[in-house]
Amino acid sequence: MYSILIACSAAVAVCLSSWRLADAVWGWALLWGALAFLGAMFSVNYLVRKRITAVMAGMQALLADGQKEMQARVNAFQNRPTGDPKRIMAEMEKFQKKLLTQALEHTMKLEPFCKWTLLFSRQLNTTLMQFHYQMQDFKKVDELMPRCLILDPMSGAMKMARQHVNKAPVEEIEKTFFKAKARLKYNQSVLLYSLMAWIFLKNDMPDKAHALLVKGCKDNENETLNRNRDRLANNKVREFNNANLGDEWFALFLEQPKIQMRRQQPRLDGRPF
């Protein structure tokens, strides 16, 4: 890492200079060397993170503008449902893929900083993995996953989803769940609990799914968790549904959303439009 090399060079230079000026008193020389190391590390990391923040801000702005445009198209179709819903869905997926490709290209501007900041390469791999996941490039996702930092609910859920699709043992997926959940605070693990319960049901383990949701309702305040817990308690396994989690759930591509079309209100002047 360049930042460590620069800090070490500064520390050695200051240490040797202090030793000569202090008549071979190594204690003071080492102290000034340590302070030089910390000062150099702070300065370099501050400048690098400032550049990283600027690139990330540009990427977030790009995604925000794209999401607004995509939501406007969806709302327009729901308010005035003309055309084939499947064609509209295909157009939305095409637009989203184009947007993610642009964001991915923008993110690659961060690659040079991997040599400057400790662990940043793993953070960047996590961001790249999430973009490739949304583009459904799962081969690349599986390639990047071992080099990612699983620190947020979505990246943890993505890892669990890939393990499920790749037919990993349930015990292995459960380990990923507990590891990802351990870092989260109250009301942050809804997606992880919902996904793990769904995986239990897919493996014919309704009792484990119900027990998990009971714990999940203690760690979170969420209507979907409560509803699914009650359904499993009443043996209504077929009514288990995570659709109310919205985009977070469907972003895992384990289930497909349904386009809901709003009924148009008739005009009072008798004109059809």
Predicted segments with their positions:
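Alpha-helical repeat scaffolds
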Residues: T101-L110, F138-R147, P169-L184, P206-G216, ...
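Helical anchoring/docking segments at protein termini
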Residues: M1-G58, K258-F273
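Hydrophobic/aromatic side-chain positions at a characteristic register within alpha-helices
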Residues: L63, M92-F95, Y133, H164-V165, ...
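Residue-level recognition of tetratricopeptide repeat
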Residues: Q60, Q130, A161-R162, W198-I199, ...
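N-terminal topogenic membrane-targeting module
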Residues: V25-N125
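Long, non-transmembrane cytosolic or organellar matrix-exposed soluble domains/tails
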Residues: R183-F273
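Short coil/turn linking the two alpha-helices of tandem helical-hairpin repeats
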Residues: M59, G66-M70, Q136, V165-V170, ...
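Alpha-helical adaptor scaffolds
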Residues: Q96, W116-L195
